[in-house]
Structures are given as C-alpha cells and as structure tokens.
Amino acid sequence: MTECFLPPASSPSEHRRAEHGGGLARTPSSEEISPTKFPGLYRTGEPLPPHDILHEPPDIVSEDEKDHGKKKGKFKKKEKRTEGYAAFQEDSSGDEAESPSKIKRSKGIHVFKKPSFSKKKEKDFKIKEKPKEEKHKEDKHKEKKSKDLTAADVVKQWKEKKKKKKPTPEPESLPVDIPRLRPVFGIPLIEAAERTMIYDGIRLPLVFRECIDFIEQHGMKCEGIYRVSGIKSKVDELKAAYDREESPNLEDYEPYTVASLLKQYLRELPENVLTKDLMPRFEEACGKTTEGERLQECQRLLKELPECNFCLTSWLVVHMDHVIEQELETKMNIQNISIVLSPTVQISNRVLYVFFTHVQELFGGVQIKRVIKPLRWSNMATMPALPETQETIKEEIRRQEFLLNCLHRELQAGVKDLSKEERLWEVQRILTALKRKLREAKRQDCETKIAQEIASLSKEDVSKEEMTENEEEVLNILLAQENEILTEQEELVAMEQYLRRQIATEKEEIDRLRAEISEIQSRQQHGRSETEEYSSESESESEDEEELQYILEDLQRQNEELEIKNTHLNQAIHEEREAIIELRVQLRLLQKQRVKSEQLQEEEELGKQNVPSQLPRDNLPETKAPKDQPKALMEQMKPSPIKKTGKKLSSETLI
C-alpha cells in the first residue's frame, strides 16, 4: 500500500531550491507535519500516520542540502524555545536521528502550551534555568579552591569544622528569685485582710480600702458611677498589680475603672459577705411587717457576723450612702445602686433597701478612714520629703515599723523575693532618717519652750525666788544639752579617726593592686609579642578566646551586681554606725546621771550623820560610844570601790 501526504506549505528556501532545480525532493518528516504545528490536520487522540520504510527515499543528500539542514535545525531550536511547543511522544524523523540531543531536550518538557508565547514568559523560563547554572559554577569554584589549598589550610578547615560540631557549653544562668504569685482576688476575706491589712488595725483588704478612698475623693461627681463599666484592659492591669502585692497609683486611672475593679473584687469573693448561715435569716428579718422588728432583728444579726464581714458590709453601705447623697451629680439613687450591687455581692434588693434606708440606725458609728501609704525612698540620690511635726513623724514611724515587721515575718517564713529584701533595706533607711528627724524636732521644741519662758519671764514681774527656780531649771536643761552635744562630738571624733585609718589602709591596698595590674599588663604585652612570632604554632591555643571573652563578660556583669550590693551595704553600715553613736551618747549621759545621783545620795548621808554631832551634849543620851565608832565613820566617808569600778567600766565602753 502506498501512503499519501498532503502537500505542506513550502518554506522560502525550498521554493528557491525548486526554482533552481538543485537536489532531490525529499518526503516531509513527522516533525514537520506534527499535530502541534498543524493543529487542524489530525483529530485529537488519533495516532500519527505511520511511516513505511519501503517508501522512504534513499539517504543521498547533497552538500547544499546538508548546509540547509544545519540552518534548518538551528531555526527549529529557536522556534522550539520561542514557541514553547512540547511533543506528546517521540518522533522518528531523519533529522532527529542525525541529532540525538534534540530528542533529549524534547523529553524533558511534558506540558502542552498555547502557540502564543510572550517575551515575559520566555524571560521567566530563562530565569528558572539560571540557578542550576550558578550551582554548577559554584561547584567548579569550590573544586578549584580545594585544588589550590595547602595542607595547613586543610588542617585549619578541619579544626574549624570540629569546633563548630563541638557542643558549646551553655552558660549557667544565675539563679533568679521569682516571686511567688499570691493573689488577693478570689481568696477568702479573712486571709486577704490579714495579708494586706495596714498599720491602723482595720481588718479590711487593702484593695477594698484604696478603691473606696479613691472614689470618695474623685468619683462623687461622675455620672453613673458603678453603673458605667471601666476599660477591661485597665481593670485587668490593676488586678494583676494587686495580685503581685504591689500598690499601684490609682491617680493614673479613671474612677469608672476603679469602680469596676471594686465590683470585680466583691464578685470574686468565694463566700457571701453575710455568710451562708445568716443570709436566709436576714431575708426573714427584712420580710417582717413592722419597721421596728426589722431593725431590731437586723441589728442582732449584724452583731453575729465575723469581724471582717461586718467591717466590709458597714464600709460598703456607708460608702454607697455617700454616693446616693450626691444623686444630683451621680444620677444614682437607691434603686440604681441596688440593681448594680445586688448581683455583685449576692444580696437581695429587699435586704439592701433596708440597709440603705436605715444607715444611721444600723451603721451609725462607722467612719471611712483615709488610707495613708507608707513613705517610699526608692531613689538613693534624692532625700524623700520627711514630715515636720512630732506627731506626723511618730505616725510615720508606726507605719514603717508595722511594714518592717510584716516584711521580716514574710522573709522568715521562707518567701524568697529580691524586691522584698530591697524594700526591707529601704524601710530601715527611712526609719533611721525619721528617728533622727524626731530627735531634731524634740530639740527644737525644747529650745522654743525655753525661749518662750525666758521671754515671758522678762516681761512679767515675778519675785526673785521664782526667777532663781526658773533659772535653775533652764540651766539644768542647757547643761544637759551641752553634755549631750559634747559626748556626741567625742564619739564623732573617734569615728572620724577610725574612718581615716580605714581610708589610709584602703589607699595602700589600692596602690598595691595597681602595681599588680601593671605587672600583669606588662606580662601580657610580653606574651603577645612572643605569640605574634610563633603565631603559626599557637593557632590551636587561640580557639578558646571566645569562651574566655564570654567568661570575662560574665565576670564583669557579676562585678557590677556586687558593686550595687556593696553600695547598699555601705549605706546600711553608715546608718547603723550613726545609730550606734546615738546609743553610746545616751549611755554616757545615763552613766553621768547615775554618778551624779550617787554623789547626791552620799552628800545626803553625810549631812544626816553630821546633824547629830552638832546637837548640844545635854540632849545626847548618856551612853558610851564604842571605841570603833570613829573608824566606822571614816569608812563611810571613803568612796565605795563599786563606784570606782563603775567609772572604769564607763571609760572602757567609750574606748
């Protein structure tokens, strides 16, 4: 059988060849009439027309056709790249047999694309092929480098790889004392009151008192207080601060936020404020017919409440009564307050109505006291503003001593917290400063009283006896002050001499350490010069430089922390020394007073003994005195050895 082919569209080169009559006519290959180039020639899914080997012309090609074939092959390559066609199966044309590289390239692409292939896609396709070429170039570059390497370089690379593979020991982190979270919200009322109670002894949690105090000052003119909710993120921030046992500054927040915080605290109480046992009895009492019976029963039940529960209930009702009194500005009456407060504290509206309408009868003696926070001294560079009068100083000392006892109790219980230890030192510093200020205030008050007395005495006409008595009192006070100042001056001079000796020894130690440092630096410079000469031999020893650098940085950081601790300790030692000087002055004054009192007693005893000797002989009884009586009198006249030893002991204590 013979096969028939449709005449393909002749190319310009074939047309010229036909005109000149050069070469033999050849049959078209399967590639030239493939369905990809002529999509309308064959149906989709039909196989290509078979090639019969018998009908193929002989492989006799002229030199012109060979040149033309090469040009055509190049043209086909460009055409494939630009058009982006892909063969569905292998072609068995004569051209592909001559150039097997074409078959390999056609196998790599198995995607049929549209005939229209833009330049942009062609660029993208070329960019995708670039990384392979770059990798090939890098591999060649590495091979060249590996050929050029010497033995020393290979050893160096091996050491670096080994060092990278070695697991570097992670630095041991310093133990950090993480403070335990001791929440205030959600715990029983008694526990919260005992933990956060302040110096005045009112058994209420600090968060409750501070919130009420802030709203009493800043929230009485806010419309819809306790009804309008605050910002939730701010409320959560305040709650977290109180759970960390901090005292945030409520001045930075709105009254609505603080009111929402108070409601949240009351809502999270694990037990009802009126207790589970008494709550139904309160309901029964408020449901009675007559008002007198209701009041009498409520008063009796309120006395049965625990101390913390009664205190919280009374403060809450009195505070809400203050809010109701400002109804014109707050827009909150009894009904609104009851609607807001009833689901929060889980008390019915009927009970709350009885409480709010009979505040004076049920909670008449309750007064809301302001919270005064203890003084802080966080910045060592500045001195805090201490109170001026003696009463305020004493009150602040009571606050600080109460806080100091609480901190000591918590630290002795095993709570490890660096912030509490720092607060302990801070409270001790404040206490020493307050006590010093109190002594100065007492001295100033005494001086002012003396000046006032002198002024009043100069103006008034008084007798000489009164003047002498007052002058004696004034002189005694002045002498006592003078003695105190002199003894204090002596102690300060002794302390100054001791500190000067210590400074001299410290300077000598500094000079010695500087000499050692200079010697070590000279050794290091000498060692560096030697290592530079033999650097090729000591490459292995320089591997640990990074570790040494890290150790040095760690030591420097530890040194900074120790310096901070040292400054705190020095400050505390200085304050303790001042306290010791004051105690020594007081001891010396007491010893002097004791010596004076003993001398006065001796003089009185001698005076009593001399009185009977001056009486007339007639009045004396006719009894013979013993022979040893003069000796006994002489022994009484002599100072006792106990007094001498007492004086010696006082001098030894001063030394």
UniProtKB/Swiss-Prot annotation:
Sequence repeat extents: 133-137, 138-142
EC number(s) stated in the UniProt entry for this protein: 7.6.2.2, 7.6.2.3
Subcellular location: Cell membrane; Cytoplasm, Cytosol; Cytoplasm, Cytoskeleton, Spindle pole; Nucleus
Keyword Endoplasmic reticulum annotated: no
InterPro entries cross-referenced by the UniProt entry: RALBP1, RalBP1-like_Ral-bd, Rho_GTPase_activation_prot, RhoGAP_dom
Gene Ontology cellular component list: cytosol; lamellipodium; membrane; mitochondrion; nucleus; plasma membrane; spindle pole
Stretch list, region Mediates association with membranes and could form transmembrane domains: 149-214
Reactions catalysed, as given in the entry: an S-substituted glutathione(in) + ATP + H2O = an S-substituted glutathione(out) + ADP + phosphate + H(+); ATP + H2O + xenobioticSide 1 = ADP + phosphate + xenobioticSide 2; leukotriene C4(in) + ATP + H2O = leukotriene C4(out) + ADP + phosphate + H(+)
Region span, Required to maintain nuclear localization: 494-510
Source species of the chain: Xenopus laevis
Region (2 X 5 AA tandem repeats of E-[D/E]-K-H-K): 133-142
Stated role: Multifunctional protein that functions as a downstream effector of ralA and ralB. As a GTPase-activating protein/GAP can inactivate CDC42 and RAC1 by stimulating their GTPase activity. As part of the Ral signaling pathway, may also regulate ligand-dependent EGF and insulin receptors-mediated endocytosis. During mitosis, may act as a scaffold protein in the phosphorylation of EPSIN/EPN1 by the mitotic kinase cyclin B-CDK1, preventing endocytosis during that phase of the cell cycle. During mitosis, also controls mitochondrial fission as an effector of ralA. Could also function as a primary ATP-dependent active transporter for glutathione conjugates of electrophiles. May also actively catalyze the efflux of a wide range of substrates including xenobiotics like doxorubicin (DOX) contributing to cell multidrug resistance.
Protein name as it appears in the record: RalA-binding protein 1-A
Sites marked Arginine finger: R227
The organism's place on the tree of life at top rank: Eukaryota
Segments of this protein annotated with the region Nuclear localization signal: 102-119
Residues annotated to bind ATP: G69, K70, K71, K72, G73, K74, A413, G414, V415, K416, D417, L418, S419, K420
Basic residues bias (residue ranges): 69-79, 102-118
Domain Rho-GAP positions: 187-383
Mediates interaction with REPS1 and REPS2: annotated segments: 496-655
Biased composition regions of type Basic and acidic residues, renumbered to the chain: 52-68, 119-150, 619-630
Subunit structure: Interacts with the active, GTP-bound form of ralB and ralA.
Region listing for Disordered, in residue ranges: 1-153, 520-548, 600-655
Membrane disposition: Peripheral membrane protein
Main location (coarse class): membrane
